[in-house]
Amino acid sequence: MSIANLARRVVRALTPYQSARRIGGKGHVWLNANEAPLAYPFTIEGGRLNRYPECQPAEVVNGYAAYAGVNPDQVLVSRGADEAIELLIRTFCEAGEDQILICPPTYGMYAISAETCGVGIVEQPLTTSRQPDWPAIADRLSDVKLVFLCSPNNPTGDLVGRDGLIALLEKARDRAIVVVDEAYIEFCPEASVVDLLARFPNLVVTRTLSKAFALAGIRCGFTLASPEVIAMLAKVIAPYPIPEPIAQIAAQALSPMGLELMQERVVELNKQKAAFKAALATLHCVKEVFEDKGNFVLVRFVDGAAVFAAMKAAGIILRDFSTKPGLDNSIRVTIGYQGEMDAVLAVLRDLPSPSF
């Protein structure tokens, strides 16, 4: 007998999430994971490493609450926003009974976390204008416990319409929790829906330090919600989820100086993004450039496979989304520093016209 037969059926059937790092391949220009292009120095004090860390480090909780404009009892720190997604499913969904709703094409971990927990998935694709289908979602509220929305959406870069979200939250009162993933919100902070937490106890917002804060390597995320939701999640989270060095780095990132550096990075990356989009508009191989509210641009090419192969041959690693619904020939490009973006454009300019 194979030892695999002892695993849960759902795990045996599970296809693991194909993270950018897992499927990236080999290259010297990495623009496939929406990471920041450069790392920044932090200091770590080792005098407390012999002790278990705080479950919820106060300096991090208070720092993020002040940054996000909420109360500390509305914040839960986790091992990345991915753990926040899983905690929400484990807390509010009964395995084998309940379902979540997602709007593909969108971030893959919502579905993976649900599958791992034995929770069903209802798919309600985005509309042709790449917005959630609000009436269709409202019709399914009796069937689901959690609705996951990503704003800006990964991979399309679109923002969730605020009016549609408010109407959905009204209809979902006492019926379902609506989760808005704001992993990329620092690149368009004016579009945050955190202010709606005061009106809707069934709204949850997830955040991360991985993108604009340039800290993907430390895996630190946040859940912003009503104190009641946070208290429920705190029952389920591991006893010591945030290692002491991670808490120290996160606290430094959330200090006034850390926030100022983050905002400077955002300004620079948004400039790079605008210049990159302007250059794309001049190229014969580009068919469509999607919305650009994150630190990435999704591009539909005339021949996406040829572009992806040419980039790979040049050692440039991008993320292919051509198999996702409505995204044929589409490739996502993370915004890096200028030299990296110039390298991408050089490959695109060298593509022979007859190929398209």
UniProtKB/Swiss-Prot annotation:
SUPFAM superfamilies reported in the protein's UniProt record: PLP-dependent transferases
Keyword Nucleus: no
The reaction(s) this protein catalyses: L-histidinol phosphate + 2-oxoglutarate = 3-(imidazol-4-yl)-2-oxopropyl phosphate + L-glutamate
EC number: 2.6.1.9
Cofactor(s), by name: pyridoxal 5'-phosphate
Modified positions (N6-(pyridoxal phosphate)lysine) in chain numbering: 211
Transferase recorded as keyword: yes
PROSITE patterns: AA_TRANSFER_CLASS_2
Covalent S-S links between cysteines: none
GO BP terms, alphabetized: L-histidine biosynthetic process
Pathway: Amino-acid biosynthesis; L-histidine biosynthesis; L-histidine from 5-phospho-alpha-D-ribose 1-diphosphate: step 7/9
A Pfam family recorded for this sequence: Aminotran_1_2
GO-annotated molecular function: histidinol-phosphate transaminase activity; pyridoxal phosphate binding
UniProt enzyme class: transferase
Keywords tagged on the record: Amino-acid biosynthesis, Aminotransferase, Histidine biosynthesis, Pyridoxal phosphate, Transferase
Quaternary structure and interacting proteins, as annotated: Homodimer.
NCBIfam families: hisC
Similarity comment: family membership: Belongs to the class-II pyridoxal-phosphate-dependent aminotransferase family. Histidinol-phosphate aminotransferase subfamily.
Protein name as annotated: Histidinol-phosphate aminotransferase
Species whose genome carries this gene: Aeromonas hydrophila subsp. hydrophila (strain ATCC 7966 / DSM 30187 / BCRC 13018 / CCUG 14551 / JCM 1027 / KCTC 2358 / NCIMB 9240 / NCTC 8049)
